[in-house]
Design a protein with these regions (language model features):
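Juxtamembrane intracellular "pre-TM" segments in multi-pass secondary transporters
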Residues: 15-30, 218-251, 443-447
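Helix-loop boundary and gating motifs at the non-cytosolic
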Residues: 21-80, 245-252, 256-275
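Intracellular juxtamembrane helix-capping segments at the cytosolic ends
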Residues: 56, 144-157, 353-366
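Glycine-rich segments within core transmembrane alpha-helices of 12-TM secondary carriers
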Residues: 83-84, 163-185, 378-389
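Helix-to-loop junctions at the C-terminal end of transmembrane segments
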Residues: 86-101, 299-311
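A membrane-interface helix-boundary motif in multi-pass transporters
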Residues: 103, 186-202, 394-419
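Structural signature of the two symmetry-related core transmembrane helices
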Residues: 104-120, 314-329
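Multi-pass alpha-helical transporter architecture, strongest
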Residues: 123, 206-215, 414-447
């Protein structure tokens, strides 16, 4: 049995005119290495799944049920600022970084360790202002790591395996959500929520160590001919306006992932719209999250391969339709069982989307500065929750005040379905053909 090929991005990421071997000639990577490249997603999503779905909404609901939606919007807005600025900026800096450990690893290690510090702040915060402050700082540190980390797929994965790598990423995100919500739910049941919050960070650090210890990314990046300040400022330079497909895809991701953030109001939905007690609502949200997770996982791997065969856009359109059916079911559900069952098509749609979406991102970005553009596109992920809550949160509170408490969360679920429709329309403007390294050539059909 041959030893696994070492992952070396240095040969792939020189300046465009100096690249000898085209990207499409890379040898295939073993499944074990694709898993290694994806494992850190599990750690990242463990934190955000546990916080955003269970811990933060539950704590805000305890502070003030009447204004929970508005407070959630405030904390999400505060959290959105950091990803928009930090992720593309640190991503493009890492594109040009040269260290003995490689370009991306130093940022990943620093970000993951700081995550634990700021999670401790969240765990022991006793008021809303402190909670917002530490949530913002956690977004800063997490995105300090995520921006460079997202450059790995375009750096290291050959074009023919991007769909599979994207599916594995979707799987890890799903597993991370299940693990995070499971830890948070257990912490709530045992009245050990601060300890559970710290445990989220422990899981992330473990996955970070696995990633850093097993991936050899090489040391060299493109030759730096500009000062670091100029490179950092270039993250959102005006040349991004020339990348119309990247901008449209940013809107696609913003809307689709915004709909996914309907899970943020699941606690309030089951407490208020379905009339469950706090303890029962927490338990059923974990069950619903597990169902969504399993459905997403089952769809993620085949979704990536289906997108390789039939094209990225058809798979994403199908994903949107299936997820919308699930959201409509949740909106009109007459009882908790019907609502939980409706999360199944929602999860399937999300799994298909996550696999095809990541592959489409890797296809359309300019490869010379992958960290920059993956960071920009992932700003859609960072902004998705805040944008959804900014829209759906006040609508939830207003409709609840006008038509009764149970109505608000149902209307917010319907807003998520509208987001999916907007995403589908925006996708029609994205040219899905693959861009190769160096010459900007478009490869393949327009599926």
């Amino acid at each position: 049995m041959q030893p696994p090929r070492r992952l070396d991005s240095a040969q792939q990421m020189e300046e465009p005119m100096q690249t000898d071997a085209p990207e499409r000639s890379r040898a295939s990577l073993p499944l074990s290495q694709l898993l290694t490249l994806s494992i850190y997603w599990l750690g990242i999503q463990t934190i955000w799944g546990g916080l955003n779905i269970t811990i933060i909404p539950g704590r805000l609901d305890d502070l003030s049920r009447e204004t929970q939606g508005t407070m959630l919007a405030i904390i999400m807005i505060a959290g959105a600022v950091a990803p928009i600025v930090i992720q593309p900026t640190v991503g493009v800096i890492s594109d040009y970084t040269v260290t003995r450990w490689g370009r991306r690893k130093p940022y990943i290690v620093i970000g993951a360790l700081l995550d634990v510090v700021f999670l401790a702040g969240i765990a022991f915060s006793n008021d809303f202002v402190a909670l917002v402050a530490f949530y913002f700082l956690l977004q800063v540190s997490s995105n300090f790591a995520q921006g460079p980390f997202q450059g790995y797929v375009p750096d290291l994965v050959p074009a023919k395996q991007v769909g599979t790598a994207s599916g594995l990423m979707g799987l890890m995100l799903t597993l991370g959500t299940i693990v995070g919500v499971g830890i948070a739910t257990l912490g709530g049941i045992t009245d050990q929520l601060p300890l559970a919050t710290l445990a989220l960070g422990f899981v992330e650090v473990v996955t970070m160590v696995i990633l850093v210890a097993t991936v050899d990314e090489g040391r060299a990046g493109p030759k730096r001919t500009r000062p670091w300040r100029e490179i950092a400022m270039s993250a959102w330079a005006r040349d991004i306006l020339e990348q119309r497909d990247v901008l449209w895809l940013l809107l696609v991701r913003l809307m689709f992932l915004g709909a996914y953030n309907a899970t943020l109001i699941a606690i309030g939905y089951f407490r208020r719209s379905q009339g469950l007690s706090d303890a029962d609502a927490d338990t059923i949200v974990f069950v619903a999250t597990a169902i969504v997770g399993v459905s997403t996982a089952l769809a993620a791997i085949p979704g990536g391969r289906l997108s390789d065969r039939f094209g990225r856009r058809p798979v994403i359109w199908t994903a949107g339709l299936i997820a919308a059916i699930g959201l409509v079911g949740v909106t009109i559900a007459p009882n908790p069982a019907f609502a939980v069952g409706s999360w199944i098509p929602f999860g399937i749609g999300m799994g298909l989307f996550l696999s095809a979406d990541w592959a489409l991102m890797a296809d359309v970005i300019p490869k010379e500065t992958a960290g920059r553009y993956m960071g920009i596109l992932n700003a859609g992920t960072a902004m998705a929750g805040p944008v959804f809550i900014i829209v759906a949160g006040p609508i939830q509170d207003l409709t609840a005040a006008a038509f009764g408490d149970p109505v608000g969360p149902r209307v917010a679920m319907a807003v998520a379905a509208v987001f999916l429709g907007i995403s589908a329309l925006a996708l029609t403007r994205v040219d899905p053909r693959r861009r190769e390294l160096g010459d900007g050539a478009l490869v393949g059909s327009g599926a």
